[in-house]
Regions:
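Residues immediately within or flanking Cys/His clusters that coordinate Zn2+
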Residues: 3-5, 43
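DNA major-groove recognition helix of helix-turn-helix/homeodomain DNA-binding modules
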Residues: 115-135
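Short cysteine-rich clusters marking metal-coordination/redox-active sites
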Residues: 8-11, 46
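Short metal-binding segments enriched for Cys and/or His
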Residues: 34-63
Length: 151
């Protein structure tokens, strides 16, 4: 974000002030719409028109609320699951057939995985037979400049 003070995106005037609001929204994720309610969310609000501006911290809280509401793994759960198996990000990414940077974004909260990937990670972390199968059949190269290896 740009340094404070910001202009209001609605009325284009300077005059955003810190505020605490009971924030309600609906967020679409993976083909579903989730209603979210975040009481006492710290935001910035325009003194002139009342518009709300979300900073990075507010966006992180909204994303965390989405994960809870949708029943998705939290970033730290993904990281702990990987570490409990003694895997590097590269190893887990290869088994899940995703790019290592994608897995890194899931673990840091920068991106929310789709429900199908969330379920695949849960199975991978909990079911040794599924883990072995995915490791044996991993044909996706995490280097996007390399073609997939033969099966």
């Amino acid at each position: 974000m740009k340094p404070f003070p910001w202009k209001c995106g609605t009325c284009r005037q300077h005059g955003l002030v810190p505020a605490v609001v009971d924030y309600q929204t609906e967020i679409a994720h993976d083909g579903r719409v989730y209603p979210l309610s975040l009481p006492a969310l710290k935001v910035f609000q325009c003194e002139r028109c009342g518009a709300i501006v979300l900073d990075d911290e507010a966006c992180k809280k909204i994303t965390a609320a989405l994960r809870v509401t949708a029943g998705l793994l939290a970033p730290e759960e993904i990281r702990r699951g990987r570490e409990a198996l003694g895997l590097s990000q590269e190893q887990l990414a290869r088994s899940l057939q995703v790019d290592q940077e994608t897995l890194s974004r899931w673990e840091t909260g920068g991106q929310t995985p789709q429900r199908s990937m969330d379920q695949l990670m849960r199975i991978y972390f909990r079911v040794p037979e599924a883990r072995r199968f995915l490791e044996e059949t991993a044909t996706f190269s995490t280097d996007l400049n390399q073609p997939p290896s033969p099966a």
